[in-house]
Swiss-Prot record:
Organism: Pseudomonas syringae pv. syringae (strain B728a)
Database matches in InterPro entries: SecB, SecB-like_sf
Protein name as it appears in the record: Protein-export protein SecB
Gene3D superfamilies cross-referenced by the UniProt entry: SecB-like (3.10.420.10)
Compartments in which it is found: Cytoplasm
Subunit structure, as described in the record: Homotetramer, a dimer of dimers. One homotetramer interacts with 1 SecA dimer.
Molecular function as annotated in GO: unfolded protein binding
């Protein structure tokens, strides 16, 4: 037994797949309550609509930016109570993956990391707007990625990173 590092093990570790979160940040954030303060005097019977989108782009070398956009519109009856949108972004170091694994990592794994931060930002804005807390349910980004991949295959498209 020796205390010397195994050069083969070090080389394999450097050449193997690597994934590292470099930074998480809010890229854009907005909150609108067009009917306040009148909306606060109404009975609260909300309906929630959630739209989400992801995009990714290669920055330099093996660094990628992934942006998760969540847009939430809450109606109370026929009126819009509030609209909140967040673009939660992250910079990731990703290397040593084949095209399929890279596409899945950028399209599902990274958004899974970003979602709790976006959900917290939305809840915080909603509460600061004097509305009841809004805890969004978890999103299955693997299933959404699989659906998008199937749609692209049927359309003859291939996933790309811009």
């Amino acid at each position: 037994m020796t205390d010397q590092p195994n050069n083969d093990a070090v080389a394999n570790e450097e050449n193997g797949p690597q994934f590292s979160l470099q930074r998480i940040y809010v890229r854009d954030l907005s909150f609108e309550a067009p009917k306040s303060p009148a909306i606060f005097r109404q009975e609260w019977t909300p309906t929630v609509s959630l739209d989400l989108n992801t995009r990714q782009k290669q920055l330099e070398g093996d660094f990628y930016e992934v942006v998760l956009t969540l847009s939430v519109t809450v109606n109370n009856g026929d009126e819009v109570a509030f609209i909140v949108e967040v673009q939660q972004a992250g910079i990731f170091l990703i290397k040593g993956l084949d095209d399929g694994a890279m596409s899945h990592t950028l399209g599902a794994f990274c958004p899974n990391i970003l979602f709790p931060y976006a959900r917290e930002a939305i809840d915080n804005l909603v509460v600061r707007g004097s509305f009841p807390a809004l805890m969004l349910a978890p999103v299955n980004f693997d299933a959404l990625y699989a659906q998008e991949l199937q749609r692209m295959q049927e359309a003859g498209e291939t996933p790309t990173v811009q």
